[in-house]
């Protein structure tokens, strides 16, 4: 038996998962929730040591479960990493200790730094470097987070002066802690705002513009090769041989390996990736151009257009924790099925701004259309619809950017929210596309495990593609007139939320 394993470190939890190479079947796993810290409004941090410690604990617990099944840990032939992207960590090379909390991708503290950077560009535009990086100048990406750390954390400047400063996204931190290798993969590097997308190298121009030292950045490697081996613990000697940003890992897990194939992940936020092949397309419609994957140093880089949404599972959590409308996410479906519509209510849950296609970090959440008959059921249904509306806007942007009029006819979806069948029906109706759910629920983990297996030569792409991935398919039940009217109303609601925090 060949087992492929994956570390999946996300905004909500750390996981370690073990899959059968031949079938993709999940053999066993362990998950530990991780804390998000909110020291100020708009600030979101995590403890880097907690991220590492929970990963190590998940590995140990999973190995215990594996052995209880009568399976030896020796059957694990490779490990891949899927990680929350953009989240930025600085640490001391000598002590191995973080110099500050991880600044999470959702964090907006660098909004003023983004404005200042935009004002220094020749075009006075957030898109000054989009042709080179595929990204706008925005607080979402790592470059501005690192700049803030240099400006505000004296320990960072001291470590740099002493030649001990290390910086990376979560993948780099974990791989370094587990193997000693100081690397990132090309998919994660493409999320920093420091990568030249065409050369796949750190950009001297961008590092100089943001006043960041290029020499502290990790080595860029492909998504599937041996970076190092576990240096201690129950996996000692096992190759760590795959790495993908979590959304790219989901794209691989869904088998979106050919141009035009598209997936949408509903995690804390919402992330749509459309495979665009080996030539990057720079979006004119508010999408990001990002690296999808590269399976080996000598293989071509495959790119993707990405819609990144700030609205996702965090909306359900908000309804549970802040409004107390539900005590458990599982209550949402029954509650929402008890009403026919939202009674005219529209919920724009832009708590930390809006991403694709608006890129407005000053947008804030709003509920419109409340009347004396509005109940919590209507607000909950409006929340589910908000997530689907956001995805519909992403699909429209993708299709406008795709050359040759390519249509996205099917959307492959994953994430915690798709357990709600009503939500899948809502997606199909609002987007006017077939919605396909996967057999494998841990799709990001599976994608990372496959990358690790390819990197360690334990599985081939052909073997992977022979496996069936589809579970259920939902088809639209509403017509185009209904869809157009609803989307127009949604866009009107979004307008009201934009610019609020200026």
Curated annotation (Swiss-Prot):
Keywords carried by this UniProt record: ATP-binding, Glycerol metabolism, Kinase, Nucleotide-binding, Transferase
Top-level class of the enzyme under EC nomenclature: transferase
Organism: Caenorhabditis elegans
Binding-site positions, ATP: 15, 268, 313, 416-420
Pfam families: FGGY_C, FGGY_N
Record family assignment: Belongs to the FGGY kinase family.
Name the record gives this protein: Probable glycerol kinase
Functional pathway: Polyol metabolism; glycerol degradation via glycerol kinase pathway; sn-glycerol 3-phosphate from glycerol: step 1/1
């Amino acid at each position: 038996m060949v087992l492929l394993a994956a570390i999946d470190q996300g905004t909500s939890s750390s996981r370690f998962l073990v899959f059968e190479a031949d079938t993709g079947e999940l053999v066993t796993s362990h998950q530990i929730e991780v804390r998000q810290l909110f020291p100020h409004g708009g600030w979101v941090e995590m403890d880097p040591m907690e991220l590492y410690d929970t990963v190590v604990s998940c590995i140990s617990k999973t190995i215990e479960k594996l052995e209880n099944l009568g399976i030896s840990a020796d059957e694990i032939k490779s490990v891949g990493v899927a990680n929350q992207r953009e989240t930025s960590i600085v640490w001391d090379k000598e002590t191995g200790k973080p110099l500050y909390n991880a600044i999470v991708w959702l964090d907006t503290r660098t909004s003023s730094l983004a404005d200042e950077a935009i004002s220094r560009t020749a075009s006075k535009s957030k898109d000054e470097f989009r042709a080179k990086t595929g990204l706008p100048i925005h607080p979402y990406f790592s470059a501005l987070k690192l700049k803030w750390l240099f400006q505000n954390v004296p320990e960072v400047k001291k470590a740099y002066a002493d030649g001990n400063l290390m910086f990376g996204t979560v993948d780099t931190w974990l791989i370094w802690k587990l193997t000693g290798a100081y690397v990132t993969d090309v998919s994660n590097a493409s999320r920093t705002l420091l990568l030249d997308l065409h050369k796949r190298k750190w950009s001297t121009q961008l590092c100089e513009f943001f006043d960041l030292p290029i020499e502290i950045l990790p080595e860029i490697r492909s998504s599937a090769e041996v970076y190092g081996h576990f240096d201690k613990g129950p996996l000692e000697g096992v190759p760590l041989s795959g790495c993908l940003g979590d959304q790219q890992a989901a794209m691989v897990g869904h088998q979106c390996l050919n141009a035009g194939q598209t997936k949408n992940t509903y995690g804390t936020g919402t992330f749509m990736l459309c495979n665009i092949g080996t030539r990057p397309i720079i979006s004119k419609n508010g999408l990001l151009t990002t690296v999808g994957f590269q399976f080996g140093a000598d293989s071509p880089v495959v790119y993707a257009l990405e819609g990144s949404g700030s609205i996702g599972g965090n909306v359900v959590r908000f309804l549970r924790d802040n409004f107390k409308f539900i005590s458990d996410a599982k209550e949402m479906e029954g509650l929402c099925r008890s009403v026919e519509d939202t009674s005219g209510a529209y919920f724009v849950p832009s708590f930390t701004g809006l991403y694709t296609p608006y890129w407005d970090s000053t947008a804030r959440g709003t509920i419109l259309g409340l009347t004396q008959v509005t109940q919590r059921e209507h607000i909950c249904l409006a929340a589910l619809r908000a997530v689907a509306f956001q995805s519909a806007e992403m699909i429209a942007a993708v299709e406008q950017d795709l050359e040759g009029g390519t249509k996205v006819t099917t959307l492959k979806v994953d994430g915690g929210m798709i357990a709600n069948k009503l939500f899948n029906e809502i997606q199909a109706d609002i987007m006017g596309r077939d919605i396909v759910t996967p057999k494998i629920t841990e799709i990001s983990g599976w994608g990372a495990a496959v990358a690790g297996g390819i990197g360690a030569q334990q599985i081939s792409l052909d073997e992977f593609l022979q496996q069936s991935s589809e579970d259920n398919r939902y088809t639209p039940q509403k017509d185009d007139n209904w869809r157009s009217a609803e989307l127009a109303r949604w866009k009107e609601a979004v307008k009201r939320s934009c610019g609020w925090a200026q």
